[in-house]
């Protein structure tokens, strides 16, 4: 009985630490959040051309309500028109125990101009799947998003 009491006392003492540790981001998720933030910054500064550079050779973009665009097809697309911008913020990331695959998701804002020159703002959510490459770098293998109402 005494051993059982000691076991419960030890468990009660370490339980808060175990719960706290489970709620902390892992180094893997921290890395993916940083990669995603670097990706977003590059696109904010350099547009569509920067977007493509973060994709693996076999990476694809699953378009909102549309088809699948390969990296090669992305490279052929024209640069964004003046006044077009894409910004996003990762909300969560997680990495596989193997340490070579992970995902991020978050919210995006896409701004463009219509034919009349008026600014059109599209809000949405995205998911990026990241894969560690043979050279040790990380690249996006799948990127997808869907539009959603303006956040409140």
Regions found by a protein language model. Give the residues of each.
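Positively charged n-region of N-terminal signal peptides that target proteins for export
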Residues: 1-4
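Bacterial N-terminal signal peptides
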Residues: 7-17
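A beta-strand edge to alpha-helix "cap/lid" segment located at domain peripheries
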Residues: 22-53, 58-152
């Amino acid at each position: 009985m005494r051993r059982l009491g000691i076991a419960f006392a030890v468990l009660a003492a370490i339980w808060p630490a175990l719960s706290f540790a489970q709620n902390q981001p892992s180094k893997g998720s921290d890395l993916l959040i940083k990669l995603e933030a670097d990706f977003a910054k590059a696109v904010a500064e350099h547009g569509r051309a920067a977007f493509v550079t973060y994709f693996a050779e076999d990476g694809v973009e699953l378009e909102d309500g549309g088809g699948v665009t390969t990296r090669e097809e992305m490279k052929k697309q024209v640069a964004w028109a003046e006044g077009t911008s894409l910004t996003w913020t990762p909300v969560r990331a997680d990495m596989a125990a193997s340490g070579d695959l992970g995902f991020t998701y978050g919210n995006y804002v896409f701004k463009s101009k219509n034919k009349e020159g008026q600014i059109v703002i599209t809000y949405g959510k995205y998911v990026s799947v990241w894969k560690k490459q043979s050279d040790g770098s990380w690249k996006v293998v799948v990127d997808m998003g869907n539009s959603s109402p303006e956040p409140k």
